[in-house]
Structure formats: C-alpha cells, structure tokens
Amino acid sequence: MHYMGLFSRAGNIFRQPRALQASNAMLQGNLSLTPSKIFVGGLSPSTDVELLKEAFGSFGKIVDAVVVLDRESGLSRGFGFVTYDSIEVANNAMQAMQNKELDGRIIGVHPADSGGGGGGGGFARRGGYGGGRGGYARGGFGRGGFGGGGYGFVR
C-alpha cells in the first residue's frame, strides 16, 4: 500500500507538465489560429455580407466574411468578421477602415484574435446569454461567449 501512494504522487508529478504543455499549445493555437482575420464592430442592422465584402474587398483577397446574427431574432448583432489571405492585407484594411463610415455607421476594426475585452464565459461556460456576451458595445468580442452560443452566421 505504501508504494501505491508513492506511485500516485509520482504520476501526478509527471502529469502536471503534460497538462501545462497541452494548455500552452492550445493557447498558442488560439492566438495564431487566423492572424489574417479581423473583427468589424459597430455595423448597421442593414449591413449584410455582400456590403461587408464590397467595403473590405478593395484591400485584397477575402477568404471569408461573416455578419453575426442573433439566434432568436435573426437580426444582425452589429458585428462581423473578414478573413484575408494574408496578414499584411488584413493590417492594411484595419488601418484604412478604422473609424470609417459604413452603411451610415462609424465602424471599429480590430484583429479578431486580440481578445479585446467583452464577454465570454471561457471554456467551462460557453454560450452567450448566461455569461457575459461580449459584442462591440461592451468593448470587444469574447471568444467563449461566441463559441457555442448558437449565433447564426451569414456568409
């Protein structure tokens, strides 16, 4: 029995670094997942994906564009994302479009992976309505609140 406790403690010692390594790898993966993806906030309720592509398409090739919709009402949540084929193009678009008018509204443009404040319940509490919901009006987009919250996408 004495040896069981020893092996148990030894097992915990060996498990800890692996857990830390996995955590670090996951963090690194999140931070570099899509560096050419930008967050566009302050969108008008009438702004759709086509208008978003039209406004941001002049900077370079758009790989993907999304306007996030409320799951229940189907209305725009006032933000979206544009993904370019390169980081340089994304940076140029962010600089050029920051605080510009689009569809009657002044928009804010930031790197999507910056974690710029706002909601998110983290890994344990995904889903928008229970925890902080994030969103542009609250200072940014929270990854956790977006992940499993069931918000619709328009592509």
Curated annotation (Swiss-Prot):
GO terms for molecular function: mRNA binding. GO terms for biological process: response to salt stress. Keywords: Mitochondrion, Ribonucleoprotein, Ribosomal protein, RNA-binding, Transit peptide. Its main location: mitochondrion. The keyword Repressor does not apply. Induction: Down-regulated by salt stress. Pfam families: RRM_1. Residues 36-114 form the RRM domain. One of its GO terms (cellular component) is ribonucleoprotein complex. Residues 1-27 form a transit peptide. It is found in: Mitochondrion. SUPFAM superfamilies: RNA-binding domain, RBD (SSF54928). Component of the mitochondrial ribosome small subunit. Possibly has a role in RNA transcription or processing during stress. Belongs to the GR-RBP family. This is Small ribosomal subunit protein mS86.
